[in-house]
């Protein structure tokens, strides 16, 4: 119920603008015909507008006298939910915004705070009619320009609405862009808001995808926040990736990679919000089409999977885990597809020439080193670098140099070196865009380092200490063998000779005292032995058989009967490997960063950049058993 002051003492002309008494008929086009407003209706409308204008001005006059009663009435009406019929209508809102924009200093006091807050928190303001929306945005600009302290509140509201689809946040970004240029110092607290309002990993896929889309759009016009935005995205994706891997590990042998690769993702409303109004209450809900197979941010944001074969549907524990895997995988799939598609658009020959693309790549490389590489057993996040590096030959060179530098840096921790070598071997094996020159270069680097290592340290094998002392050597040798399994066809020169003299090199390595066939990943060594024998590079099966016999007899290490007793004791000690240390190394050796993806849309996006085992092995084995 609108309250008005007593206006009986004021003459009518104070309220009503002079109206031409000539009978006029105003017509508006309508889809069903013409809508006619009679002169009396026009008079009522003008009279109503004039009365409301007078009421607002009177409320401001009272506010100047420290009476905020009428301002409070207006603020309460503005603060009502959008579905409440008592909320201020668009015409009166136009009047209010016009008057306040011209009298912004009159509501600067604490008594005007509630009115300002009710306006900046106006529910679904982005859905206002264009004319009213322009007045609303103008008021916000006047407010924050005249009273800068309000920009912090406004920017927080704008960022909190990033859960809306990108089509609904056009005005949000326009205002952010405007004020980031006007008040560049505000980037500090906006950076905080970006992290604060990022949806939880257990939130809906729609919100996660929409928020990611809006962050990427913000990065497009605010390069100063670029690193913070990429860092935030990488952290959140890693969080989902790791949780997904943990849930997969909990299933143990109930589900394998083949099952996950065969899943079919379909829209399923049951896995999404129970109500479509959820986003409306938290800034809105609308439609948005994501590119390149990314899931539609406005549709039900959980895609169903086919029932995983081998699962016992009667076990509630497994059913819950399967449901969690479905939800996490669809979220991860959508976000990664969106991010990689965006990155591909940013790293073009033109952008690299201008330097902008180089900046994006360098940022992602830095975050790979600081966030991705130290995180154990991520399954999908690393494909961002896998994809972006293959956009240009120079970027692949840069990524390879990064991995080599980390793998053999003196000051790096041993675990990080081994992890980097795993990435190096997996990347060379799987990256389809790599040139032969790049592959031969890496192989040459590895063979040179391994040869030098054997020459310098082979005698240490007979000294006291466990074989874990040489895990760096084993990681490098395994990486090279893994590369050879995938790329053996390109290691012959035009005369049929082996590049890097691989035939001599491998034979020397496998018979060295380090016995790499025993301490490297068993599956990789078996496949290497099979291919090496087929290609007449090295003969390993007799050594592998001898190693297996030693294990069966419970003999750890080797014993040389020709040596003295104290030397034999040293050998036994040197060949021993504590169970915990060995298991840790085995786990690390068994990690292949670029194993096949099971995220449906993301796997499709990676297809032209990725070498399947079936493409490289020919007659050997399927991709399911290469690792």
Swiss-Prot record:
GO molecular function, one term: RNA polymerase I general transcription initiation factor activity
InterPro entries per the UniProt record, alphabetical: RNA_pol_I_trans_ini_fac_RRN3
GO BP terms in the entry: transcription initiation at RNA polymerase I promoter
Segments of this protein annotated with the region Disordered: 263-305
Keywords tagged on the record: Nucleus, Transcription, Transcription regulation
Location of the protein in the cell: Nucleus
Domain of life of the organism encoding this protein: Eukaryota
GO terms under cellular component: nucleolus; nucleus
Keyword Transcription: yes
Record's compositionally biased regions (Acidic residues): 263-282
Main location: nucleus
Function text: Required for efficient transcription initiation by RNA polymerase I. Interacts with Pol I in the absence of template DNA and stimulates recruitment of Pol I, but does not remain as part of stable preinitiation complex.
PANTHER family, per the entry: RNA POLYMERASE I-SPECIFIC TRANSCRIPTION INITIATION FACTOR RRN3-RELATED, TRANSCRIPTION INITIATION FACTOR IA RRN3
Additional record remark: Present with 138 molecules/cell in log phase SD medium.
Quaternary state and interactors: Monomer. Interacts with NOP53.
Annotated family: Belongs to the RRN3 family.
UniProt name for this protein: RNA polymerase I-specific transcription initiation factor RRN3
Native source species: Saccharomyces cerevisiae (strain ATCC 204508 / S288c) (Baker's yeast)
Taxonomic lineage from the root: Eukaryota, Fungi, Dikarya, Ascomycota, Saccharomycotina
């Amino acid at each position: 119920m609108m309250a008005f002051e007593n206006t009986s003492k004021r003459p009518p002309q104070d309220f009503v603008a002079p109206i031409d008494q000539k009978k006029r008929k105003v017509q508006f086009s309508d889809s069903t015909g013409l809508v006619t407003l009679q002169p009396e209706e026009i008079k009522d409308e003008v009279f109503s507008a004039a009365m409301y204008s007078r009421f607002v001005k009177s409320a401001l006059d009272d506010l100047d006298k420290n009476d905020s009663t009428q301002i409070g009435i207006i603020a309460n009406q503005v603060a009502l939910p959008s579905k409440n019929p008592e909320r201020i209508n668009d015409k009166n809102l136009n009047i209010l915004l016009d008057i306040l924009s011209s009298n912004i200093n009159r509501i600067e006091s604490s008594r005007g705070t509630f009115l300002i807050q009710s306006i900046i928190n106006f529910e679904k303001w982005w859905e206002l009619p264009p004319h009213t929306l322009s007045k609303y945005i103008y008021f916000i600009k006047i407010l924050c320009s005249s009273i800068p302290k309000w920009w912090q509140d406004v920017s927080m509201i704008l960022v909190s609405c990033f859960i809306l689809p990108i089509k609904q946040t056009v005005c949000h970004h326009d205002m952010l862009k405007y004020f980031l240029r006007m008040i560049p110092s505000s980037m500090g607290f906006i950076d905080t808001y970006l992290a604060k309002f990022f949806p939880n990993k257990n939130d809906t896929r729609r919100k996660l995808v929409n928020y990611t889309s809006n962050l990427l759009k913000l990065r497009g016009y605010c390069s100063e926040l670029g690193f913070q935005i990429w860092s935030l995205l990488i952290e959140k994706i890693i969080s989902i990736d790791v949780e997904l891997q943990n849930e997969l590990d909990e299933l143990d042998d109930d589900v394998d990679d083949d099952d996950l690769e065969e899943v079919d993702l379909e829209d399923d409303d049951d896995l999404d919000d129970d109500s479509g109004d959820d986003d409306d209450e938290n800034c809105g809900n609308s439609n948005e089409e994501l590119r390149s197979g990314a899931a539609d941010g406005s549709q039900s944001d959980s895609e169903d999977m086919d029932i995983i074969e081998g699962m016992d549907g009667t076990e509630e524990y497994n059913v819950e885990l399967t449901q969690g895997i479905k939800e996490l995988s669809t979220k991860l799939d959508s976000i990664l597809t969106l991010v990689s598609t965006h990155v591909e658009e940013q790293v073009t020959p033109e952008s690299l020439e201008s330097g902008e693309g180089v900046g994006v790549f360098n940022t992602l490389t830095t975050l790979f080193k600081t966030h991705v590489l130290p995180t154990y057993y991520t399954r999908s996040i690393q494909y961002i670098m896998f994809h972006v590096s293959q956009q240009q030959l120079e970027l692949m060179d840069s990524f390879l140099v990064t991995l080599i530098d980390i793998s053999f840096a003196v000051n790096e921790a041993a675990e990080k070196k081994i992890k980097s070598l795993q990435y190096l071997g997996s990347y060379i094996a799987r990256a389809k865009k790599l040139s032969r020159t790049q592959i031969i270069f890496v192989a040459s680097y590895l063979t040179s380092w391994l040869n030098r290592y054997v020459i310098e340290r082979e005698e240490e094998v007979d000294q006291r200490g466990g074989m874990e002392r040489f895990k760096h050597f084993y990681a490098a040798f395994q990486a090279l063998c893994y590369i050879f399994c995938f790329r053996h066809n390109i290691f012959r020169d035009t005369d049929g000779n082996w590049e890097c003299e691989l035939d001599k090199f491998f034979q020397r390595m496998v018979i060295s005292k380090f016995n790499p066939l025993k301490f490297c990943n068993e599956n990789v060594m078996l496949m290497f032995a099979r291919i090496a024998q087929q290609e007449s590079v090295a003969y390993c099966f007799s050594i592998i058989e001898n190693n297996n016999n030693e294990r069966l007899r419970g003999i750890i290490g080797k014993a040389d009967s020709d040596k003295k007793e104290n030397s034999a004791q040293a050998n036994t000690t040197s060949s021993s490997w504590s169970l915990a240390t060995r298991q840790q190394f085995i786990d690390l050796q068994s990690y292949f960063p670029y194993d096949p993806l099971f995220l449906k849309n993301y796997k499709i996006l990676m297809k032209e950049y990725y070498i399947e085992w079936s493409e490289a092995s020919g007659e050997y084995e399927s991709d399911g058993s290469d690792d």
